[in-house]
């Protein structure tokens, strides 16, 4: 697999297609260029989805996200483009992409875009106690 930016998203078979489960990813190094000024824009992307038959492969996702580094994109457009491309690649039951852009001109921009497969209904939510820290880092 390449180590250069790429628009190709790879997938693998969902190991448990009979169960709805939630995949959460945090992508802290998204960059693109402001189409007006050419200045870099930075964001943290949060990808949440419930897969159907396919899951997105992580290295291809990293290279795909990297491919926007030198592209001029409005925040709203790039968030929706990424969601659309991920939906085409994986055909999930549900997918939400949240893009939290760093401050620009004194304004923080958050864009949330969602996809829901027609006819899919989520299971009722089960409320569980939260752990003190949801971090993957132990210390």
From Swiss-Prot:
Major location (coarse): cytoplasm
Keywords carried by this UniProt record: Cytoplasm, NADP, Oxidoreductase, Queuosine biosynthesis
Coiled-coil stretches: none
Disulfide bonds, paired cysteine numbers: none
Active site per the UniProt annotation: 34, 41
Membrane spanning residue stretches: none
GO cellular component, one term: cytoplasm
EC number: 1.7.1.13
Pfam families: QueF (PF14489)
Residues reported to bind substrate: 56-58, 75-76
InterPro entries noted in UniProt: GTP-CH-I_C/QueF, NADPH_dep_7-cyano-7-deazaG_red, QueF, QueF_type1
Oxidoreductase as UniProt keyword: yes
Domain of life, source organism: Bacteria
Catalytic activity: 7-aminomethyl-7-carbaguanine + 2 NADP(+) = 7-cyano-7-deazaguanine + 2 NADPH + 3 H(+)
Family per record: Belongs to the GTP cyclohydrolase I family. QueF type 1 subfamily.
Protein name, per record: NADPH-dependent 7-cyano-7-deazaguanine reductase
